[in-house]
């Protein structure tokens, strides 16, 4: 039976929703603290066609915002296909360096501008040299934490949240109509790109899965968790070992990889003849020549930690006389103290029976990965709602969290990569306009008439 996120649903949901909630809360806090307003004259990839003016008619705003959203999605799709081609032709190092440059640019320029705005708004007494040193160290550490090995996962998670906050804070400066059309267009694009045949994101995931490689992308990875019910089974089905061959990253650090059971058994059989300290198995040798052993002993004796070369040669010569089943039975008995100590004794047979399930993805061991774009556009929606009223902020937050929970449930059912934007964004947009057009007038009316406090 395949493992599911439902086995540890609460921990998985909290591990994803907590950083999303923190990101949205800090974006709302920045919006209120810095009094962020839409800048109609801002020029970016999101408004290449039409620059919104307050004096424009509704029809002009509608047509211009729709054109901006279409162009923005087309640009994102084109860049994504370029990334697919680069990854297909093994330009992985180039992609990693590009991601590091992107992180440096976001933290250094966009984050630096927000940092200066905070200093000016709150009149923080700091000189320019100290400010530059702090910003430089903060940027360099964030850049190194993207793909460098040996970085604590908590630090990497924090920088992913920070980059989401910085980009979302800049997106909130876009005009209102353009922002809403871009959010809806991105939700639809995410749905097509991940699920449609030939979609760029689907091609990336399938290509990475076929190569058994990690995607060179900015994703938030929740800490992997294993439920108590699956812990014993996962020990047998997906043994974890520290491998120094193919699992060395660019920085030279050794990564933790999942080793299949048949690989472990094969390594164990190959190394059993090369170990300096061999376990000596002395069998009853009544049917063996008298020259091999003079003292016949009944039963089986084991000396697990004997390093004598002669004893090793004797053990090897005796072991080669048996068939493969005898070798496996001897190894089972020799390893029984270690197996019982590590709690794998009951799962040895089960592990052998699960060798054919190498392609099963164990989500409970890997954890859930959420793209940085999901953090950004969740926060953009809430930040845009914060420019109107706190009531719309509450409604949009509940809608986004509910949509994310539905996505996690679907993830556990289908056990494949799913888009995280469509459900949450659609619910958030619907809740925003329902709250703004229906709920807020009703609440304000009954409150002013002292019918509700």
From Swiss-Prot:
BP term (GO), one: protein processing
SMART domains: PSN (SM00730)
Chain spans, region Disordered: 226-248, 292-329
Membrane side Cytoplasmic: residue ranges: 1-8, 90-103, 154-159, 202-369, 414-417, 439-453
Family named by the database record: Belongs to the peptidase A22A family.
Tagged with keyword Membrane: yes
Motif (PAL): 419-421
Record protein name field: Presenilin-like protein At1g08700
